[in-house]
């Protein structure tokens, strides 16, 4: 998967030199034109009090700094001409897309389990069109940003994501969002198997569960599937030449 060098037989100049992003376990060379910033599931469900994760018993009290860091990364990406892609996770209001008892998703989704335990929440959690499904107010997509709906943990499953990337010559995916140990890691892993280079900006992600879940996910990514960097390093690397981030 490479960026097109010709269109209708006409050579296209490569105007964007590769940048070296500081990362673990080693720096990674990336071209802005082959890179996308991916914002995973920054919805009220995952980042707001009263959202699904909060109602299911997960701590979302420290998501504020993550939202601020994602905003910073988005601004840097847009300034560098890097596309920003938002995922929204959820299902139709009747939950047909969630699957029934024959689907493992029906048994493992904490949103579905919470609604079965608390019938008064039926139809509220992760239902398209509802408050829970909406992106948080602080992370409103801007003109030119892309929003991709998804119905499972991995953003590659039954979505337009891979097509969106391939049609733009994207091969580097820089991940932010919630939850590091669930949808972020699932999508990055699937990208690895599809030959995408995946990087997580650790301080722009948040786990579902205790802190060790965050550290375990970052360990898995750094050791087996990709790279780990930071928002400041991303912003500095892709700042306009000659300008500070």
Swiss-Prot record:
EC number(s) recorded for this UniProt protein: 3.5.1.110
Annotated catalytic residues: 41 (proton acceptor), 150, 183 (nucleophile)
Family annotation (InterPro entries): Isochorismatase-like_dom (IPR000868), Isochorismatase-like_hydrls (IPR050272), Isochorismatase-like_sf (IPR036380), RutB (IPR019916)
One protein family per Pfam: Isochorismatase
Keyword Transmembrane: no
Enzyme kind, highest EC tier: hydrolase
UniProt-listed GO biological process terms: nitrogen utilization; uracil catabolic process
Gene3D superfamilies tied to this protein: Isochorismatase-like
Positions of disulphide bridges: none
UniProt GO molecular function: hydrolase activity, acting on carbon-nitrogen (but not peptide) bonds, in linear amides
Assigned keywords, A-Z: Hydrolase
Domain of life: Bacteria
Reported function: Hydrolyzes ureidoacrylate to form aminoacrylate and carbamate. The carbamate hydrolyzes spontaneously, thereby releasing one of the nitrogen atoms of the pyrimidine ring as ammonia and one of its carbon atoms as CO2.
HAMAP family, A to Z: RutB (MF_00830)
Protein family: Belongs to the isochorismatase family. RutB subfamily.
Name of the protein described by the UniProt record: Ureidoacrylate amidohydrolase RutB
Originating species: Pseudomonas syringae pv. syringae (strain B728a)
Lineage: Bacteria, Pseudomonadati, Pseudomonadota, Gammaproteobacteria, Pseudomonadales
